[in-house]
Amino acid sequence: MDPSQHNPPVGHQIVHVRGDSETDLEALFNAVMNPKGAVVPQSVPMRMRKLPDSFFKPPEPKSHSRQASTDAGSGGVLTPHHVRAHSSPASLQLGAVSGGSLSGMASAGASPQHLRQSSYEIPDDVPLPPGWEMAKTSSGQRYFLNHIDQTTTWQDPRKALLQLNQATPPSTVPVQQQNLLSPASGPLPEGWEQAITPEGEIYYINHKNKTTSWLDPRLETRYALNQQRITQSAPVKQGGPLPPNPHGGVMGGNNQMRLQQMEKERIRLKQQELLRQSQRPQIDLQPSTANQDAEHCDELALRNQLPTSMDQDGSSNPVSSPMAQDARTMTANSNDPFLNSVSSGTYHSRDESTDSGLSMSSYSVPRTPDDFLNSVDEMDTGDPLAPSMATQPSRFPDYLDTIPGTDVDLGTLEGESMAVEGEELMPSLQEALSSDILNDMESVLAATKIDKESFLTWL
C-alpha cells in the first residue's frame, strides 16, 4: 500500500466510516450493564509472570533508612485501616466506656478516625449522664428523656459527650468531666479527702468546713498561686491598676519614668495656669466703693511721688528715668493686691502681650495708667468727684507729662512729640474701659505702628 495515500493533500481531510460502529457501541453498553455476561479475557496470573522474588516478600525492617523506607511501594509494615472501620459497633472500645469513665474514648488510638463515627449506637450498659433516662417506643426505637430540662430527644447524649471530649480541650468540658479527664497531680491539701459516687464521679470532702465540692482543691490552689504571681509581677503605678508587663522589668522601668515625666509636666502646666489666672484683673471680687477708695489712694500717692522723682533726676526726658522710678514706686506700693503678687518675682511681662511687631528693646506697648482712665470716665459720664479730689483738674497736665507715649491734655493737644520707648507695662485695669476708648487706641496703634514720631490724639 502506498504510504502517500495516508497523507492527504494540504487543505483536505479523509473521513473513515466503519461499518461495525453500531455493534461495537452496543457491546460497550452490554459490558457495562451486564458485567458478568461480558467476556473478560483471562490475564496471566501474578505467579506466572516474570517478577522478582522480592515482589512477593515484604522487606525486612532494617536500620538503613533506604531499606526501611515505606515509599518503596510495599506497605507490609503498616496495617491497613479502612476509613469507615470505626463505624461498626464491633470496633467500639467498650472496655474503657463501661467502667463509668468516658475518658477512655479520648485516647482511642493513634489511627485516623472517620468524621461519621457517630453512626454507631452505644450499648445500653453504658451509663447515661446525670439527669438523663433512656426509654423505648412500641416499635423498639430508643429515645432519651432529660429530667433537668424536661425534654425528650432522639439523640444519644453520650455521643455528644464523646465528641466533645475528642474535639475540644479539657478546659471547655464541665467541671465534673474536667476532674475526670485531667485530674490534678500531687497530694490533696490537709483536711481534704477524695471520694467516688456510685455513678463513678469523683468529689472532694473538706473535713475542716464539713463541706463537699466537685472542684479539685489542688486546682484552686494552683489558680490562687498563679493569680498571686501575676499580681506580684505587675508594676504598681499611679492612676489605677495596669496589666502585667510581658517584656520584663526594663520596659516597666521605662514606662514608669515616662509616666513620672508626664505627671511632672501636667503639674507644671497646672501651676502656670493658676499663676496666669491669679494675674488677671479681679474686677468682681470687691465692691465698687472699695475699688474707688483704693484707686484714689493710689492716685494721690503717685501724684506726690512723680514730681519728686523728676526733681531728683534733674532730666527733662519723660521716657527713661521718670518712668523707671514710676514703675519702681508702683511696684513697691502695698495698696494694690495685684501689684503685691507681681513683686513676688513670678510675673512675666510678656505673658499677655497681643502684638509681636515691636523690637526687643521694649517689653510691650505702653498705655495710659489705670487711675487716669478711671478719672476720665468719671468726668465724661458726669459722675461727681470725691471731696479729696477737688484739686485734681489743676494737676492733670503735670501728671500726664510723665507718662511715656502720651501727651494728652483735657481738650488741648500739645505740639511737641515724645519718643515712644516702652518700659514696664501697667499690670491691670481696675475698671472696665469703654468701647470708644478701646476702638480709638486700636485704630491709632494699627495706623502708626507705634512710630517714634507719632502721638496719640484723644477726642
From Swiss-Prot:
* Tissue-specificity statement: Ubiquitously expressed throughout development.
Query: Where in or outside the cell?
Result: Cytoplasm; Nucleus; Cell junction, Tight junction; Cell membrane
Instruction: Give the CDD domains listed for this entry.
Output: WW (cd00201)
Species for this entry: Oryzias latipes
Instruction: State a single Gene Ontology molecular function.
Output: transcription corepressor activity
* Protein modification: Phosphorylated by lats1 and lats2; leading to cytoplasmic translocation and inactivation.
**Domain WW, residue spans:** 126-159, 186-219
Q: What is this protein called?
A: Transcriptional coactivator YAP1
Sorted alphabetically, the keyword list is: Activator, Cell junction, Cell membrane, Cytoplasm, Membrane, Nucleus, Phosphoprotein, Repeat, Repressor, Tight junction, Transcription, Transcription regulation
Q: What happens when the gene is disrupted?
A: Embryos are sensitive to deformation by gravity and display a markedly flattened body. Mutants show delayed blastopore closure and progressive body collapse from mid-neurulation, surviving until just before hatching (6 days post-fertilization, dpf). During body collapse, tissues and organs including neural tube and somites become gradually flattened and improperly aligned.
